[in-house]
């Protein structure tokens, strides 16, 4: 099984508020990194995509392509309040293109 774990980008989706999401969420995604280590030790083929990290693809379409390039059987999203909408949109796009992905 191939698992891709994703740390999505995000933004302030409240109109009129300053957007500090990229700064506030710029941290190592320790939760999915821990899960990846455990899954890898158990023999699962796992990848972590940190879309807030350096060199990450920009935009939902490019990020969806990046996820699908890993040919996942399962995709996991780790999201905060500011990134859950991007995470949700990524999952919708992945499932539309490859419905059998869990």
Regions found by a protein language model. Give the residues of each.
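A short, structured N-terminal alpha-helical element that caps or precedes a catalytic domain
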Residues: 1-102
């Amino acid at each position: 099984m191939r698992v891709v774990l994703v740390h999505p980008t995000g933004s302030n989706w409240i109109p009129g508020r300053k957007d500090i999401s990229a700064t506030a969420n710029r941290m190592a995604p320790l939760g999915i990194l821990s899960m990846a280590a455990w899954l890898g030790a158990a023999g699962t083929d796992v990848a972590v995509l940190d879309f807030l990290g350096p060199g990450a693809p920009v935009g939902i379409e490019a990020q969806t392509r990046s996820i699908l390039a890993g040919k996942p059987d399962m995709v996991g999203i780790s999201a905060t309040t500011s990134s859950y909408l991007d995470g949700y949109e990524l999952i919708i796009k992945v499932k539309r293109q490859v419905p059998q992905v869990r």
